[in-house]
Amino acid sequence: DFVNGRIGEQYGARMLGKIGVDNTYSIGVTQAVMDTYHPAAISDLAPIAGELRFGAEQDFYTDAGSMKYGPFVAFYGLQFQEAIQVDIMLKYTAIKSGSYDVMVVYATDGLNKDANLTILEDDKSFFPEYNGVLTVRDGLFEDFADRAPELEQTLELLTGQFTNEVMSELTYRVDVL
């Protein structure tokens, strides 16, 4: 309600229901890590982090902000063997080539599938939710009442219809195929 009110005040728009996607930051691990250690959640990395190399784009290592490398490793009690900065455009190439074992990703990125990454559960909820919603301008449904009287109800049908897995597959088809 708060966010919807702010969007209305600032942009003259409103949100419809959540479509079911949470494109938050996530932690992806390689198949080799899965085969050797079988982690299911980020907490599972704590006892093995010293054997793993962590990679992320430069922005993840900056001091400003709470969702950065320092607060992340402190929150989960992780001490990686090495923390590697990589250009955001090269991070998937780098993990596929074996430059590191663990990487910060977006949950719905199709390149996660291409790199054969497993997304670990954020079992302590470090990363905030980034829920996907449809946003429409004020007056949209009134403007289309004659031509599309069911527009609002039709768009509301999308509420809860997507998952991160579905969205990841769709972005994979766009980014890779």
Language-model segments: residues:
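Beta->alpha turn/N-cap motifs
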Residues: D1-F2, V29-Q31, I88, V102-L111, ...
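Ligand-binding "clamshell"
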Residues: F2-L16, S99, L111-S125
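Periplasmic-binding protein-like
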Residues: R6-R14, R147, L157-L177
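Short Pro/Gly-enriched coil loops immediately N-terminal to beta-strands
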Residues: G17-S26, D122-G132
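Bilobed "Venus flytrap"/periplasmic-binding protein-like clamshell domains
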Residues: G20-Y92, N164-E165
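Solvent-exposed loop/turn segments at secondary-structure junctions
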Residues: A32-D35, D59-D63, T108-L111, G139-E142, ...
